């Protein structure tokens, strides 16, 4: 038995300079697990609640001392003496202790920090790398990265309505080569945007935020950078979008202010279909607002056979909502954000449900990140085959990529890089 003997939480800073929760879990053997939780800017209304202090005198109300106190008192008292290897039981203890549907009493930032730290401690105690602790001894695949190279929407101060324009290297034989491809494209994109007179400052997730005229110009810049780096768009590198459509859905219309467009659900589907015809787009995240289920159904019926349609705000890593989507034939993929649900066990259940239904599961960071690299181990351990963890700058993003490099090295020739096979939910790829 790997008994928990102490649980300690503290307030640290995330990549945006906002407070977040870090937790240490100590076992009787002397082993310790440490984990820190992320925070989002564009959030779904049904996400688990991160507990903030609301004290305007500290961090503009964004302090997390209440969540820290909850870990150091109630949560600590509830799990000290439990076996760290019993992840599901510990997570259920946290859920029951909170007692709310959305973890609003203790805070999902409190429960998740502890859930992750328990897993790290248990893996260390077992002498296993975290990805093996999550996934067992079977064959594993490296994830294809979604690299957010141009930021818009809530992640940047520009006129681009679409929140993320991403590249996905798919023709390479290894994750290492895919990462090199992405980095080379990123550096060429910097040169191209600079030459065109755009600023090369970066957004929350490390991508550039040029004040482009619209989505097509952004994608053309990316395609130019892909070619300049010596790769072929559509063969070596595919494109992906995160619309974050809930952010510009107003009174039943999709208001793309940067492009001067006001579109119905059908009109926005046409807009996305046109982009997919012009560019090698393989994935569109949150292509409709979270509450526009009729729009989602229309989008899925129209594009779901050839485009990965990822539900983020739509599903918020919640199995109850995902089950509704599967039953109604809405989307064909789920974005997995550990802090949307608040425990690892619930996160893993969402991945399992998606796979059983033939949906893909994309493991994702948040716009407010830390140096914690747990999601890299989750992506490999659960054989998710896709990861979304930002651009090729900012150490909070690079921490995940570097961990994936270490994992690939550790696995050697037993691991595969799936490339286009990662899109097992599509029939025409």
UniProtKB/Swiss-Prot annotation:
Name of the protein described by the UniProt record: Enolase
Compartments (UniProt record): Cytoplasm; Secreted; Cell surface
Family: Belongs to the enolase family.
Co-factor note (free text): Binds a second Mg(2+) ion via substrate during catalysis.
InterPro entries: Enolase (IPR000941), Enolase-like_C_sf (IPR036849), Enolase-like_N (IPR029017), Enolase_C (IPR020810), Enolase_CS (IPR020809), Enolase_N (IPR020811)
Molecular-function GO terms, alphabetical: magnesium ion binding; phosphopyruvate hydratase activity
Pathway note: Carbohydrate degradation; glycolysis; pyruvate from D-glyceraldehyde 3-phosphate: step 4/5
Transferase keyword on record: no
Xref: CDD domains: enolase (cd03313)
Reactions the enzyme catalyzes: (2R)-2-phosphoglycerate = phosphoenolpyruvate + H2O
Cysteine disulfide links: none
Gene Ontology cellular-component terms listed: cell surface; extracellular region; phosphopyruvate hydratase complex
Keyword Acyltransferase belongs to the record: no
The organism of origin for this protein: Azoarcus sp. (strain BH72)
Gene that specifies this protein: eno
